[in-house]
């Protein structure tokens, strides 16, 4: 198992915590010098805050833990490709590297729809490693949304009876 896979497994553990709460199963860990500085998972539904994405929360926790907004030398591991908001937070917090699992065809801004993390017009760019444990990360999301659709369909059926 590679170092990236090891830390992605930790992000997957966080994603499972989100799923247990009925949240979209996305998890993240932030690592500096081989040490996990912060862990987080999606809490958007729980907190009813649009910015409570795993990446935003893990960056916030890391900044608090380190006492600085500059996360130079940090690697962010996240189970789903960052969205525009999260990619912006990565750039603004100076995260050095982003490693993600599943690609996001609807909102991915680390190479799928666009690549904000390596946009040369910004004063900071992050290295990007994509597709680490992609099947496991993507499988969790697919299963979650499949189950959610099933529940919604059953609820509609019950209403029509």
From Swiss-Prot:
Cofactor(s) needed, names only, are:
Zn(2+)
Q: What is this protein called?
A: tRNA-specific adenosine deaminase
Pinpoint the CMP/dCMP-type deaminase domain residues. Answer: 2-120
The GO terms describing molecular function are: tRNA-specific adenosine-34 deaminase activity; zinc ion binding
As to how many cofactors bind and how, the note says: Binds 1 zinc ion per subunit.
Is Hydrolase among this UniProt entry's keywords? yes
In terms of superkingdom, the source organism counts as Bacteria
Q: Could you tell me the keywords of this UniProt record? A: Hydrolase, Metal-binding, tRNA processing, Zinc
Record has RNA-binding as a keyword: no
Task: Give the family, as the similarity comment puts it.
Answer: Belongs to the cytidine and deoxycytidylate deaminase family.
Reactions that this protein is recorded to catalyse = adenosine(34) in tRNA + H2O + H(+) = inosine(34) in tRNA + NH4(+)
Enzyme class label:
hydrolase
Any single GO BP term: tRNA wobble adenosine to inosine editing
Task: Describe the task this protein carries out.
Answer: Catalyzes the deamination of adenosine to inosine at the wobble position 34 of tRNA(Arg2).
- Subunit structure and binding partners: Homodimer.
Q: Which residues form the active site?
A: 55 (proton donor)
Please tell me where Zn(2+) binds in this chain: 53, 83, 86
């Amino acid at each position: 198992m590679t170092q990236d896979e090891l830390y992605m497994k930790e992000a997957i553990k966080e994603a499972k915590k989100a799923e247990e709460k009925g949240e979209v199963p996305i998890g993240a860990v932030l690592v500096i010098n081989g040490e996990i500085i912060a862990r987080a998972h999606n809490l958007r539904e729980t907190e009813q805050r649009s910015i409570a994405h795993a990446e935003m929360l893990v960056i916030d926790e890391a900044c608090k833990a380190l006492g600085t907004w500059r996360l130079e030398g940090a690697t962010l591991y996240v189970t789903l490709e960052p969205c525009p908001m999260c990619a912006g937070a990565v750039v603004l917090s100076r995260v050095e590297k982003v490693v993600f699992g599943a690609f996001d065809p609807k909102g991915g801004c680390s190479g799928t729809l666009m690549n904000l993390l390596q946009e040369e017009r910004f004063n900071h760019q992050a290295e990007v490693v994509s597709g680490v444990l992609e099947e496991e990360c993507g499988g969790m999301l697919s299963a979650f949304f499949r189950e959610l659709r099933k529940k919604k369909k059953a609820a509609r059926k019950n209403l029509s009876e």
